[in-house]
């Protein structure tokens, strides 16, 4: 390659522990030798978040809003142990949650598939992308124990002063029990719909929304109606032009259909369903180390990509002791490629688009040629049968990817 590809503006967020080490390796070996970026870097490591009172996370989110593309390394969300370990001022919130609250949008998780890595659901030859509506429902509910006999009612008091409406939830006669009130907002459901339709168009795959509207006629019916209305008004012609479709399905039908399908579709889930199904689907494909996570905003223009796993603390402890580490970097690499591919799409940058695709192909081809980290070798042979010759450590694997990328780009005469 005679000169570097001009890549445009990208916001990158550094993270914590083993993934932070890998993040620097990815830039050094796979990105910077080939791509010149206008890079806006934010250190989201736990110490810097603490030093800035988490302002750095908010600044990073605002930068993504401005430049439309963010790539994020995995970060620590502190619990009591972490507060003590790092002597933090307070238990800072999840950076992912903070960024999502500022940007809006929907998180889509997608498996990275290699032919030689066995899947628990062997029929899934294409990814199933799960979009979780990460707002409201059970996660913002008010629930309580009903101590004894009595009525539980829900009331709505209009802010314009008109009369309030009272709904009887249940009349507890013999004993108490439990009760819950939960909600969602039209605006949030509309944003969820737009993000889902945009994702389907960008992947050129059909979209399914799952609800239980036969039981929750008003609540889930609202999701169904809003999706249908937005689809008919704004997306139907585009979907038909790309020969893809949108359908609403009952959640139980959808789970069964997903299990017997070959994959290759977007599945829009309500909050709880998405929480459950995203982990179920991830396990079905074999490994969280091979799972990308992309936040797509309703405008379809703003995207933030990251790995779907954590900071790999156990491996970092080994790294700190100078021991060999065996961390799988693939999902972190794909955070970069998905971010760069989106930058290329926004700027109509064919060279950058080719590079992002080439790097993803190199990752998959290298694994399919038998070069991989221990977690993937264990998927193939079973952990007790894995020998040292079956896998590469983190740094050996990164070197191999770097070598193969150089070869691929040289062959393409980029």
UniProtKB/Swiss-Prot annotation:
Pfam family, one: Iso_dh
Site (Critical for catalysis) location in chain: 139, 212
Protein name: Isocitrate dehydrogenase [NADP] cytoplasmic
Organism listed in the record: Bos taurus
EC number: 1.1.1.42
Expression tissues: Expressed preferentially in corneal epithelium. Constitute approximately 13% of the total soluble bovine corneal epithelial proteins.
Modified-residue entries (Phosphoserine), positions: 389
Residues where N6-acetyllysine is found: 81, 224, 233, 321
GO biological process terms held by the UniProt record: 2-oxoglutarate metabolic process; glyoxylate cycle; isocitrate metabolic process; NADP metabolic process; response to oxidative stress; tricarboxylic acid cycle
InterPro entries: IsoCit/isopropylmalate_DH_CS, Isocitrate_DH_NADP, IsoPropMal-DH-like_dom
One cellular component (GO) term of this entry: peroxisome
Entry binding sites for substrate: 77, 94-100, 109, 132, 212
Maturation and modification: Acetylation at Lys-374 dramatically reduces catalytic activity.
Catalytic activity: D-threo-isocitrate + NADP(+) = 2-oxoglutarate + CO2 + NADPH
N-acetylserine sites (modified residues): 2
Note on cofactor: Binds 1 Mg(2+) or Mn(2+) ion per subunit.
Biological function: Catalyzes the NADP(+)-dependent oxidative decarboxylation of isocitrate (D-threo-isocitrate) to 2-ketoglutarate (2-oxoglutarate), which is required by other enzymes such as the phytanoyl-CoA dioxygenase. Plays a critical role in the generation of NADPH, an important cofactor in many biosynthesis pathways. May act as a corneal epithelial crystallin and may be involved in maintaining corneal epithelial transparency.
Highest taxon, organism lineage: Eukaryota
